[in-house]
């Protein structure tokens, strides 16, 4: 490549997160393989520059940025098939979820995103299993959520989950969610432990329940027009870099979960580990969603997921 190709990668978290480190992993790989053929720059957290977290969607789609990531739930308005992976208690563990997202289900969902967005989907980062935190009381059963105002991702499926659990779900972007957690105008939120700590929620929420209610992925998307203009050498290098970065990010995320739990405990918070019976009560409460999903999404989606 005679002229350096600009690659602008961005996210919405500090440089210390698994996601930011994985973007750097991709950039380092590209520079190692292509040298002066690429000009790689990073914006770790677009919120530091006055953007909302969900602005990363249009920033990449318009080509202002080359590559980014976002939780799949943010894309459900234009790619409703992604609502399938918002279903509660869909996957039992990381291995099952990763097999689905790396396999037929992930390929199908990537195709649906590319049909509706000006993206090329390069892979899936792991946001992982999500847990409930709140400022009011310990949560052991759905009844403990009664009347709680809880921030959820912009997903109708996720909102219905918490309606069935008796809470009052409020769909909002991360930027607003952080403001409202700090201000106390929402009672609860749900996130992987790493996100809860990264955004300082554990300093305002004393009670944390390890509910594992959703498993969410973050598609890694690139500006399609840019990708299509790249030489094959860069396309191949990017695909290899992202493949390895996904494995790297998942390993980092596992350690982040351990470290984040300790940070929550060190803050003096209370962590609830559900008993088998308590967990079953949550699963039973949201059972109607799985019945409806077979009509909404079709049995084929469950087959693609290996379920």
Predicted region positions:
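N-terminal secretory/targeting leader peptides
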Residues: 1-95, 114-115, 119-307
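Hinge/lid segment of periplasmic solute-binding proteins
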Residues: 102-115
């Amino acid at each position: 490549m005679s002229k350096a190709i600009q690659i602008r990668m961005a996210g919405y978290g500090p440089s210390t997160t698994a996601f930011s480190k994985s973007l750097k992993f991709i950039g380092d790989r590209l520079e190692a393989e292509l040298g002066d053929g690429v000009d790689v720059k990073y914006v770790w957290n677009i919120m530091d520059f006055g953007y909302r977290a969900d602005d990363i969607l249009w920033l990449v789609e318009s080509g202002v940025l080359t590559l980014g990531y976002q939780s799949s739930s943010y894309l459900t308005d234009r790619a409703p098939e992604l609502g399938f992976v918002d279903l509660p208690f869909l996957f039992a563990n990381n291995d099952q979820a990763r097999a689905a997202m790396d396999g037929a289900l992930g390929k199908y969902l990537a195709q649906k995103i590319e049909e509706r967005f000006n993206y090329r989907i390069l892979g899936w980062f792991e946001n992982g299993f999500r847990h409930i935190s709140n400022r009011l009381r310990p949560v052991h059963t759905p009844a403990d959520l009664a009347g709680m105002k809880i921030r959820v991702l912009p997903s109708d499926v996720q909102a219905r989950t918490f309606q069935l659990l008796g809470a009052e779900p409020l769909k909002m972007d991360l930027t607003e969610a952080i403001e409202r957690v700090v201000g106390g105008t929402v009672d609860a939120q749900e996130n992987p432990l790493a996100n809860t700590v990264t955004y300082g929620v554990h300093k305002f929420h004393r009670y944390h329940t390890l509910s594992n209610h959703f498993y969410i992925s973050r598609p890694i998307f690139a500006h399609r027009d840019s990708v299509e203009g790249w030489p094959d050498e860069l396309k191949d290098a990017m695909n290899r870099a992202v493949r390895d970065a996904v494995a790297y990010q998942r390993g980092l995320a596992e350690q982040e979960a351990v470290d984040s739990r300790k940070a929550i405990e060190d803050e003096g918070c209370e962590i609830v580990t559900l008993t088998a019976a308590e967990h079953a009560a949550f699963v039973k409460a949201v059972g109607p969603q799985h019945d409806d999903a077979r009509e909404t999404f079709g049995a084929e989606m469950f087959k693609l997921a290996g379920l």
